[in-house]
Amino acid sequence: MLSLNQLIGAPLTALGGILCLRWWIFWRRHYRGKLITYGPYSHVRHPLYASFLILVLGLALLITIPETLMLLLITLAVIPLHIRGEEEELLKRYGEAYRRYMKRVRWRLIPGIY
């Protein structure tokens, strides 16, 4: 019998992994040095980080050991810091185009939350 953690953690881990892979394929096909605002970037401004967070959350539920909980906590602490620095760089690089994008795609990581 599967535990509740396994029933939730396994699909989240798979979903996060699939989303990371889909992001990578999208990025390889579309990035040419210009700001991308379509595809997964039309939902959140940092789709790779969102995918990775889903993956790590799933792992923390699926493999209930202190190390995966620590990985989740570190991920939750580091991703927002990294996003902040990355967005400063994107504003410098793309200027007003990135500002318009930020207004249009309000959520950095999790729609409706952050």
List the predicted regions and their residue ranges.
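Cytosolic-biased juxtamembrane loops and peripheral soluble domains of multi-pass membrane proteins
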Residues: 3-114
